[in-house]
Amino acid sequence: MKVGVLALQGDVSEHIDAFTAALRKRGYTEDSPVIEVRNPEDLAGCAALAIPGGESTTISRLVDKNGLYKPIRDFKGGIFATCAGMILMATDVGDPRVHSLGLLDMTVDRNAFGRQRESFEADIRVQGLDGGSFHAVFIRGPVVTEARDGVVVLARTDKGIVAVEKGRHMALAFHPELGGDLRLHERFLKNLGV
């Protein structure tokens, strides 16, 4: 089991650490590396890809520049997308500067929670997640304003939808890799059969 982390911008090392820990908790060892993905060749052999937070217009440009747009769209593994990654996964982002992947049929509102200084943490309830509420870190996060075509809503706040999944993909408006709670990483891996 190899997990790739899109390493163009954002909290790459935090995702690597979280997925490494989640794989170990699920019984995988060094034979299951978590690697940085910077070009299409890096995706070879990956069963999953994390698209971290960062700045969605910048990540979008870098995905195009590095020739990753089509390989990610065609990727057969699961995608775990956080914050800006959630924006890239949507079909409708409302910003022509973002070349979204369109892998989840949903509309997002970029930076719905405001500016950087308005970032916050909150305990949210995630549908089907055992162990009580999930402590979520929101940093200029998006919200999903409309989920369509089988996109399952997992969590909401008063601003809107903040967690969704469909099939092998999960998209979150917050940063689970920053809080130390691996339950969403583990759920994602379990959904992939790991």
Curated annotation (Swiss-Prot):
The gene is pdxT. L-glutamine binds at G54, E55, S56, R110, I139, R140. Pathway: Cofactor biosynthesis; pyridoxal 5'-phosphate biosynthesis. Belongs to the glutaminase PdxT/SNO family. It catalyses: aldehydo-D-ribose 5-phosphate + D-glyceraldehyde 3-phosphate + L-glutamine = pyridoxal 5'-phosphate + L-glutamate + phosphate + 3 H2O + H(+); L-glutamine + H2O = L-glutamate + NH4(+). The keyword Methyltransferase does not apply. Pfam families: SNO. HAMAP family: PdxT. This is Pyridoxal 5'-phosphate synthase subunit PdxT. It comes from Methanoregula boonei (strain DSM 21154 / JCM 14090 / 6A8). InterPro entries: Class_I_gatase-like, PdxT/SNO, PdxT/SNO_CS.
